[in-house]
């Protein structure tokens, strides 16, 4: 791609041959923009520069003659000045603000829309006074022919000199103009010159405004200069010079001749060709009058003030001026458009049109239908061609437009050949001195240059003007040789030069070959000069914008069809295609569009070719295939992030521009020319849309967006200023008023002091004493009066309040008495109504007979005369029901009628459901054995007609007797349309009974569904397996999984109007509670025959969304399966009863008032007042709807269940932590918190209480739940090198010691190389041997010295002879390391022992023992078989605490590697490494590597190196007491067992069970405790499984299957809630509760996983309980909760039931309780009332002193709602596959919740006796201590917040 400077250099040669053209002649060519000017560096760019593009020179400009330039020596307004111009050179040097000028004088390419007049830095051109008059072409040529001929070389030199003179004159004029402007600037800055014009010039200007304006005095409209000025003038609008449509006054231009200074044209040169063309057109049409152009001049000069350019950030003051400026610009655009449309431009004879390339000529002719479209053939011609060949290849068509070519063809018959100035007669050729345009040379000069091959300065039109004459000369010469005959055609006409102007294309290639490539010339737009210039500029812009190198040329275009046929749009196009599609150059030539239809429209308008018929120009696709950038061969480069953002932004802007263009031309762009507005036919979408038309890097749309952003910021800033103006004004106004008031007060004070000071002092002296006494008396009197009346009013208020209070208490007591009687009658009525309903329903469905089994006691029903109740006839009017009356008979009659209505409603509901099923086409059910109509309330004796059900035949199992009775009871429920609760104890087969009921309905009643089974997530697979096992004819559809899977399943069962038979796709739908709530809207669309809820305690909370969602499902009957209908309170029972019978049990308050209060309070055994009559009535109400059997009554073959409590004492560490927690708990705070634990209390109190309980339970489980004993290591003062990838090392990894001390010691290298370094003795030691003297004289370990000294008497080496060693061995031994010496000594002893003689056996005959030695006579103290004393001492030492590593040696706080000296010598470093890492020592100490232990070759080699050393090394083979202590202390695993008393007891218990062959279920409450148990089981190597709330459903099923089938698994760890519901684990015979649940039902369900139907062994249940801790008391409270259901559904009536207020007793010992009771009695004797806590007040909480994180949360210990939510989370298994695929982990303990609304407890009734005693005693202690007054509720002293600091052993410090 050619750069900008190259384009300037190419343009330079044309500037020597052309001058600036007159503005008058160029007025009709101001059609489009060029790249904008560079901004001034000294000032900020104004907003208009962002919104509007800068001016551009117009296209197709013909320079004026040189003489004109001499008269007007100003540079052209449309072209930059010459290369010697300082402004031009500056623009070239600064690439940021430069752009390439046009390379030729004909066309200036651009891809901009049409400009506005304000874009130019000069005033709009004006028209001359009269249209210029010129000679006709023929007369003009004749005048030229008459002149004498001039030599071509002389004429050429003369023109050169004229042009040089014109250039110098122009420069002088510019210098004068610059000085004049500068003087005006200085004059304008002087005072009084505000109204003067500002003729400042823009620096680096390539377009001096003097060319356009000429020497005019009015130079006010200029741009701001670098220096800046206070005022700037607004630019003129075109409306001042040109007419608009709104103009009412049109004046000819002659009236304004004096106001317009237009220089006359030169006389010695011909007029420009454009004017010749206009004159010729006017001459052809004499009828058309020549109307002078009209102008409307508005002389208005306004100035706007602007700030100094140095005020950065104050451009907001330009806003109004810019808005007005922009509006003027829009008006100017419209004015220019209208003016251009009014100009009729015609090309005359001989006038050159825009140059066309071969491709464009072919396109035009194709439209006109003259020639066909030729195929593109790429043929390379030789670069060396003769000029004759090129001239012979020139086009025969004349230059100009297709119309001109057509006229030339018409004139062929007249033997005319079109030249530059009109038709030329071959017989009379033009004069050689005729001027050829646009070059300005004579014909002789042009012919001479063409013949010489020098085409510099010539254009295609110049060559075409003379090519015919040159061809005729050549043919004439040939004809002279051939006989003087010119070549003629068949019709006799002279043959013209054949073919298009190919020769000129080749000639032009001489100066083009450096600019373009062959591939570029073949593109669609490379045929014209404009296209080539635009392409190169676009490519330069793209390269600059994308920061890329030269853009790829010749990129192909991939076109796609648009909506309209024949329309094509490039998918990926480069700058050439973009220019071709959006080229606006020719669209503005109105005359050529109107007459010739030759080129495309401008931006925003449709192509002129689109207006022609499709038949004349059929669309043709391009043959080239375009690939996306980076696709295909070559390397693909991913665009960077800025490029991606730029592409997205460009695409958005392109779409925005296309939409705007479809709507019509905007204010910035306009279409010039008459005719209708054209619409855009193609929407171009580029892969890359960089800025290709603006060197500044800002496109028009981007500039608009920036302008909008700047406007938004300015508006925001101004809005803030406007918003703050009133406030600041108020502040200023207030300040002003305050200052005025202060000044006024000061003035008044001054006046008083000035005029009245003397008089005031005199009066004060006279009456000072009197006034003082009177004031004191007055004050005393007023005070006494106020005290008297205040006391009087207080006494009156007290008396009045006392009387009102007494009256209120009396009225309240009377109202309470009346309300009590009323509620009693109301409850009696409701109970009577419910009893009547239950009595007859119970007789009907035989609940009594179903419960009556062998060994089970059943009460005899007392006849209360219900059969004899006389209700009267139906419809008998009864008195209104009034609970205030004492008419019991009326209440009984209303109750009987209500019961009858309830029975009738249930019967009608069941019948309506059956009718709806029949109406949908379902088969009729079989005949019922008993009709519902027979249930007549008047005759209750209907038991003999009840249904007796046998086992269904399709059931593939044998039901037991009690199960068959349960099936009969369920069948009778269905017959009556009644819902029920099957509450058999866990393990009695509730599932098989419900399955048999479905089989009974399908077999006997032909009801095949749909049935809905909702169960916990852990039991879904169990339901599916049992249905497929027992009733294979019933098709079960499992409905769970991901949302997509469920959507697929819904297509099966949610179809409307489907009938159910045996062949239906499904009969039973199985899903979970969670999915039933989520897909409630889909389940409500079905009408279910039966809905079965397994583990129905999941809906025991009536306030939960689950309870409400399931209650809204449409079903005929509901069946609840639960083993624990009552878990905590009567509220749960009411929730289940309301779910099955909402008509009867509709009020929970009434039910709780009658039953809950008395039963729950009486279970405490202290204040119980439950009457037997109430209990019997409750049983009578529940029995018809609930069937419950227990195992001991109905299951004889089931093994026994034994429960054993294992009480353990806390370990030392646990006791210390428990004691520390206990000391930081204030009993007083606990009591106050328990009293305040009401619905309106502070919820933080409850949370703190729950948190405290969790901390104590953690201590009881394991102290590591607080803080694990971490690995302890000292601080290492050193560095380590980073290891590589260990996966690549394989089995044998090389891990050298890389520890390096941070301290480095540098030693001189001379110490190592030249001696002087100390070293340890050794074979290779250099100590003392660096020199000859040290080696021989001073070294005593040499063999020579040792041998010499052995010969001397009393020598130091005399021992050598005694030991039998040679001097050489002694020297080598001395120099060897100690380890080598030991190994050699051991080897000698081994050989001596194995190979030596027996010298130590005194009884051996051949003994060589010395005779003088005496054998040992020490007696042996141990008998054979006894343990030696040495072994005993070793065992005791090993078992002692002191033998542990952490006890033997205190760990260092910091360690550091040795400091290694460093010298710059490689041999020194190697020697150091050999000393530190000796292979022999390393192998001896650590032995072989683990991978080499079993390698015989390695073992043999090791034995040779280190004989008598085991293969594992000396350190592993040595005792622990002999090995060094490791600095890394790892807690032993045994400590995990010893620190917890429960875990230590569990360890011993598991050993016993493992030895006995038992299998264990281990239940936990905390998941963190399960993690610790997993470590223990791994340590003991027990096989185990783990199931908690995070286990997915599929894994749960697999784990249960593995447990049941694999006897090798010893332990199954489960959480109580996740593993205690609905799964069968009968393979286990032992259940261990590590920590028990607060809810006894949860533990009961968990243990029944093993003790259930199918268990043949005896089940043993162990409970690990910490003695004397909170766990022991919690277990007592939990067992007391179990007695509630025994009271309700059993026979037990009295038990200890815990209250939330009795939580305090969990933290108190028996002695503390007894002491509290004694103190409470003393307090009651003194009339003390226990204080309460203000709910909203912030008090110090008892838990504040315990800054501990529970980590587990509450398990619902004190809250039923929390327990319900916890159960819901566990039973759903939050790791289920349906949604999260294992995401989320449900802990065994649920989150902390707060009391359920509705459970109101008063202080007196809510607190137990022990808690009340403790509260009174604590309060009395404070009274006696004097801290508070009696009868006052004061808060206890705040407790200090203390953190428990744990030591390294885990104990509190």
UniProtKB/Swiss-Prot annotation:
Sorted UniProt keywords: Activator, ATP-binding, Coiled coil, DNA damage, DNA repair, DNA-binding, Hydrolase, Nucleotide-binding, Nucleus, Transcription, Transcription regulation
Basic residues bias locations: 7-19, 495-507
Keyword set includes Nucleotide-binding: yes
Residues binding ATP: 984-991
Enzyme Commission number(s): 3.6.4.-
Occurrences of domain Helicase C-terminal (ranges): 1545-1695
UniProt feature coiled coil, ranges: 790-833
Compositional bias per record (Polar residues), positions renumbered to this chain: 40-53, 105-117
Biased composition (Basic and acidic residues): 189-201, 508-517, 640-651
Catalyzed reactions per annotation: ATP + H2O = ADP + phosphate + H(+)
Pfam families (UniProt xref): DBINO (PF13892), Helicase_C (PF00271), SNF2-rel_dom (PF00176)
Compartments where located: Nucleus
Biased composition (Pro residues): 55-66
Residue window of motif DEAQ box: 1094-1097
GO BP term (any one): regulation of macromolecule metabolic process
Residue stretches of biased makeup (Low complexity): 392-406
Predominant place of localization: nucleus
GO cellular component: Ino80 complex
Domain DBINO: from-to ranges: 717-847
Function comment: ATPase component of the INO80 complex which remodels chromatin by shifting nucleosomes and is involved in DNA repair.
Comment, domains: The DBINO region is involved in binding to DNA.
Subunit structure: Component of the INO80 chromatin-remodeling complex.
Family stated for the protein in its record: Belongs to the SNF2/RAD54 helicase family.
PANTHER family: CHROMATIN-REMODELING ATPASE INO80, HELICASE SRCAP-RELATED
This protein's name: Chromatin-remodeling ATPase INO80
Organism: Cryptococcus neoformans var. neoformans serotype D (strain JEC21 / ATCC MYA-565) (Filobasidiella neoformans)
Organism classification: Eukaryota, Fungi, Dikarya, Basidiomycota, Agaricomycotina
């Amino acid at each position: 791609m050619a750069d900008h400077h190259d384009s300037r250099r190419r343009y330079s040669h044309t500037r020597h041959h052309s001058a600036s053209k007159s503005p008058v002649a160029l007025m009709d060519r101001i059609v489009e923009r060029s790249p904008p000017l560079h901004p001034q560096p000294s000032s900020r760019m104004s907003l208009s520069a962002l919104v509007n593009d800068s001016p551009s020179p117009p296209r197709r400009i013909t320079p004026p003659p040189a003489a004109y330039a001499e008269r007007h020596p100003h540079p052209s307004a449309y072209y930059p000045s010459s290369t010697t111009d300082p402004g031009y050179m500056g623009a070239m040097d600064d690439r940021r603000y430069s752009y390439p000028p046009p390379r030729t004088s004909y066309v200036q390419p651009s891809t901009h829309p049409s400009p506005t007049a304000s874009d130019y830095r000069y005033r709009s051109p004006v028209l001359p006074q009269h249209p210029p008059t010129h000679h006709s072409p023929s007369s003009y040529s004749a005048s030229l022919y008459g002149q004498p001929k001039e030599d071509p070389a002389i004429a050429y030199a003369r023109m050169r000199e004229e042009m040089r003179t014109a250039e110098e004159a122009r420069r002088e004029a510019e210098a004068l103009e610059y000085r004049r402007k500068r003087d005006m600037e200085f004059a304008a800055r002087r005072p009084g010159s505000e109204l003067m014009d500002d003729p400042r010039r823009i620096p680096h200007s390539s377009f001096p405004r003097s060319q356009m304006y000429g020497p005019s005095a009015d130079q006010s409209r200029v741009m701001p200069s670098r220096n800046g000025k206070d005022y700037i003038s607004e630019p003129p609008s075109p409306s001042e010079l040109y007419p608009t449509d709104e103009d009412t006054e049109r004046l000819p231009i002659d009236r304004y001749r004096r106001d317009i200074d237009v220089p006359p044209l030169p006389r010695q040169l011909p007029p420009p060709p454009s004017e010749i063309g206009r004159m010729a057109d006017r001459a052809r049409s004499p009828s058309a009058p020549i109307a002078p152009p009209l102008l409307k001049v508005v002389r208005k000069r306004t100035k706007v003030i602007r700030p100094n350019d140095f005020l950065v950030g104050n451009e907001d003051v330009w806003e109004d001026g810019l808005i007005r400026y922009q509006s003027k610009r829009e008006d100017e655009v419209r004015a220019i458009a209208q003016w251009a449309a009014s100009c009729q431009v015609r090309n005359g004879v001989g006038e050159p049109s825009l140059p066309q390339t071969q491709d464009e000529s072919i396109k035009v002719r194709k439209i006109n239908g003259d020639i066909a479209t030729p195929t593109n053939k790429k043929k390379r011609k030789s670069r060396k061609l003769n000029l004759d060949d090129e001239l012979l290849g020139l086009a025969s068509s004349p230059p100009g437009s297709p119309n001109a070519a057509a006229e030339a063809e018409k004139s062929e018959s007249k033997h005319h050949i079109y030249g530059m100035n009109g038709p030329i007669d071959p017989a009379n050729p033009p004069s050689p001195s005729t001027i050829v345009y646009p070059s300005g040379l004579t014909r002789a000069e042009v012919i001479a240059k063409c013949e010489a091959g020098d085409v510099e300065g010539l254009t295609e039109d110049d060559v075409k003007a003379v090519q015919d004459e040159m061809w005729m000369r050549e043919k004439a010469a040939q004809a002279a040789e051939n006989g003087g005959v010119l070549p003629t055609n068949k019709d006799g006409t002279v043959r013209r030069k054949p073919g298009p102007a190919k020769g000129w294309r080749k000639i032009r290639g001489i100066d083009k070959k450096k600019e373009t490539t062959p591939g570029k010339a073949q593109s669609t737009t490379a045929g014209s000069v404009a296209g080539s210039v635009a392409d190169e500029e676009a490519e330069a812009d793209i390269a600059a914008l994308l920061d890329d190198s030269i853009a790829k040329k010749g990129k192909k275009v991939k076109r796609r069809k648009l909506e309209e046929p024949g329309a094509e749009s490039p998918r990926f196009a480069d700058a050439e295609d973009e220019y071709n599609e959006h080229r606006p150059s020719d669209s503005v030539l109105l005359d050529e569009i109107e007459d010739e239809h030759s080129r495309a429209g401008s931006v925003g308008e449709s192509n002129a070719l689109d207006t022609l018929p499709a038949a004349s120009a059929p669309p043709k696709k391009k043959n080239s295939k375009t690939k996306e950038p980076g696709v295909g061969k070559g390397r693909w480069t991913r665009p960077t992030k800025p490029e991606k953002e730029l592409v997205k932004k460009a695409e958005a802007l392109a779409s925005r521009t296309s939409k705007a263009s479809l709507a019509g031309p905007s204010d910035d762009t306009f279409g010039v020319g008459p005719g209708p507005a054209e619409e855009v036919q193609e929407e171009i979408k580029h892969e890359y849309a960089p800025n290709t038309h603006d060197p500044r890097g800002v496109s028009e749309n981007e500039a608009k967006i920036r302008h909008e952003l700047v406007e938004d910021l300015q508006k925001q800033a101004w809005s803030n200023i406007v918003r703050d103006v009133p406030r600041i004004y108020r502040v200023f106004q207030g300040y002003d008023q305050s200052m005025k008031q202060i000044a006024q007060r000061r003035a008044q004070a001054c006046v008083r002091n000035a005029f009245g000071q003397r008089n005031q002092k005199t009066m004060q002296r006279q009456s000072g004493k009197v006034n003082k006494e009177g004031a004191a008396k007055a004050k005393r009197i007023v005070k006494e009066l106020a005290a008297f009346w205040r006391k009087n009013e207080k006494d009156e208020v007290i008396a009045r309040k006392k009387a009102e209070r007494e009256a209120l208490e009396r009225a309240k007591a009377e109202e309470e008495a009346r309300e009590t009687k009323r509620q009693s009658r109301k409850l009696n009525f409701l109970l009577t109504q419910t009893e009547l309903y239950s009595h007859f329903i119970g007789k009907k469905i035989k609940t009594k007979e179903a419960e009556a089994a062998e060994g089970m006691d059943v009460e005899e029903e007392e006849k209360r005369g219900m059969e004899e109740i006389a209700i009267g006839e139906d419809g008998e009017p009864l008195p209104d029901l009034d609970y205030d009356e004492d008419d019991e008979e009326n209440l009984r009659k209303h109750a009987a009628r209500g019961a009858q209505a309830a029975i009738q409603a249930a019967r009608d509901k069941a019948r309506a459901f059956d009718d709806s099923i029949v109406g949908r086409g379902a088969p009729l059910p079989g005949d019922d054995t008993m009709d519902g109509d027979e249930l007549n309330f008047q005759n209750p004796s209907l038991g003999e007609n009840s249904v007796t059900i046998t086992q269904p035949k399709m059931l593939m199992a044998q039901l037991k007797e009690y199960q068959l009775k349960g099936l009969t009871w369920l069948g009778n429920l269905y017959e009556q349309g009644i819902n029920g609760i099957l509450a058999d104890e866990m393990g009695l087969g509730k599932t098989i009974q419900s399955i048999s009921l479905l089989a009974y309905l399908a077999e006997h009643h032909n009801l095949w569904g749909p049935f809905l089974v909702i169960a916990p997530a852990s039991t879904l697979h169990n339901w599916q397996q049992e249905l497929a096992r027992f009733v294979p004819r019933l098709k079960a559809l499992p409905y769970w999984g991901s949302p997509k899977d469920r959507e697929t399943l819904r297509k099966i069962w949610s179809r409307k109007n489907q009938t159910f038979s045996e062949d239906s796709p499904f009969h039973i739908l199985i899903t979970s509670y969670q999915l039933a709530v989520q897909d409630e809207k889909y389940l409500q669309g079905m009408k279910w025959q039966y809905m079965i809820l397994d583990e129905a305690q999941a809906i025991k909370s009536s306030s939960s969304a689950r309870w409400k969602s399931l209650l809204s499902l449409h079903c005929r009957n509901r069946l609840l399966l639960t083993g624990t209908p009552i878990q905590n309170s009567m509220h749960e029972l009411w929730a289940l009863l309301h779910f099955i019978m909402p008509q009867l049990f509709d009020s929970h308050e009434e039910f709780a008032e009658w039953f809950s209060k008395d039963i729950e309070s009486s279970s405490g055994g202290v204040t119980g007042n439950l009457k037997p009559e109430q209990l019997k009535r409750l049983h009578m109400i529940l029995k018809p709807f609930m069937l419950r059997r227990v195992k001991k009554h109905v299951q004889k073959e089931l093994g026994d269940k034994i429960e054993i409590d294992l009480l353990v004492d806390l370990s030392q560490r646990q006791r210390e932590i428990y004691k520390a927690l206990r000391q930081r708990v204030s009993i007083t705070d606990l009591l106050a918190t328990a009293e305040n634990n009401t619905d309106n209390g502070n919820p933080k109190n409850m949370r703190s209480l729950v948190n405290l309980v969790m901390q104590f339970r953690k201590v009881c489980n394991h102290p590591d739940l607080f803080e694990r004993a971490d690995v302890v290591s000292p601080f290492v003062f050193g560095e380590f090198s980073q290891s590589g990838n260990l996966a690549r090392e394989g089995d044998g990894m090389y891990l050298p010691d890389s520890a390096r001390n941070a301290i480095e010691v540098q030693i001189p290298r001379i110490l190592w190389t030249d001696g002087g370094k100390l070293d340890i003795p050794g074979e290779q030691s250099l100590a003392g041997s660096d020199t000859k003297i040290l080696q021989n004289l001073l070294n005593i370990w040499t063999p020579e010295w040792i041998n010499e000294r052995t010969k001397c008497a009393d020598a130091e080496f005399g021992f050598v002879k005694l030991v039998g060693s040679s001097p050489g061995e002694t020297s080598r031994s001395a120099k060897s390391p100690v380890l080598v010496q030991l190994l050699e000594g051991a080897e000698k002893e081994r050989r001596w022992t194995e190979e030596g003689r027996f010298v130590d056996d005194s009884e051996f005959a051949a003994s060589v023992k010395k005779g003088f030695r005496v054998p040992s006579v020490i007696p042996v103290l141990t008998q054979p078989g006894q343990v030696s004393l040495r072994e005993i001492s070793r065992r005791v030492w090993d078992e002692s605490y002191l033998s542990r590593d952490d006890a033997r040696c205190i760990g260092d706080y910091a360690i550091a590697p040795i400091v290694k000296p460093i010298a710059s010598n490689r041999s020194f470093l190697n020697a150091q490494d050999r000393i530190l890492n000796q292979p022999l020592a390393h192998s001896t100490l650590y032995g072989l590597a683990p991978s080499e232990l079993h390698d015989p070759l390695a073992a043999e080699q090791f034995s040779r190196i280190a004989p008598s050393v085991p293969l594992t090394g000396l350190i592993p083979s040595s005792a622990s007491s002999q090995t060094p202590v490791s600095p890394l202390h790892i807690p032993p695993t045994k400590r995990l067992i010893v620190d917890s008393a429960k875990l230590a007891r569990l360890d011993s218990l598991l050993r016993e069970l493992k030895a006995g062959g038992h299998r264990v279920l281990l239940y936990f409450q905390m998941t963190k405790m399960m993690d610790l148990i997993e470590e223990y089981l791994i340590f003991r190597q027990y096989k185990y499984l783990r199931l908690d709330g995070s286990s997915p459903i599929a894994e749960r099923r697999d784990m249960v299957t593995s447990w049941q089938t694999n006897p090798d698994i010893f332990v199954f760890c489960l959480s109580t809630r996740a593993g205690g519901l609905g799964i069968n684990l009968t393979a286990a015979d032992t259940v261990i509760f590590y920590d028990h649940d607060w809810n006894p039902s949860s533990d009961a369900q968990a243990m029944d996983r093993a003790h259930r139907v199918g268990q043949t062994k005896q089940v043993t249940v162990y409970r690990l309980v910490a003695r004397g801790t909170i766990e022991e008391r919690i277990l007592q409270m939990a067992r007391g909760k179990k007695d509630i259901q025994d009271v309700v559904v059993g026979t037990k009536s009295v038990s200890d039931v815990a209250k939330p207020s009795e939580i305090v007793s969990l933290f108190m010992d028996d002695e503390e309780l007894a002491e509290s009771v004694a103190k409470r009695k003393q307090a009651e004797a003194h009339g003390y009332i226990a204080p309460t806590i203000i709910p909203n007040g912030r008090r110090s909480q008892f838990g504040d002193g315990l800054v501990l994180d529970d980590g587990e949360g509450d398990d619902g210990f004190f809250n039923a709602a929390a327990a319900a939510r916890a159960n819901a989370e566990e039973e759903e298994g939050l790791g289920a596959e349906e949604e999260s695929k294992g995401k989320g982990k449900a802990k065994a303990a649920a989150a902390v919740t707060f009391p359920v609304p509705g459970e109101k407890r008063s202080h007196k009734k809510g607190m137990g006796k022990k808690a009340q005693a403790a509260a009174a005693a604590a309060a009395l202690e404070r009274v006696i201590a004097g801290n508070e007054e009696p009868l006052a509720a004061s808060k206890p002293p705040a407790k200090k917040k203390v953190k428990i600091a744990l030591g390294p052993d885990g104990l509190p410090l």
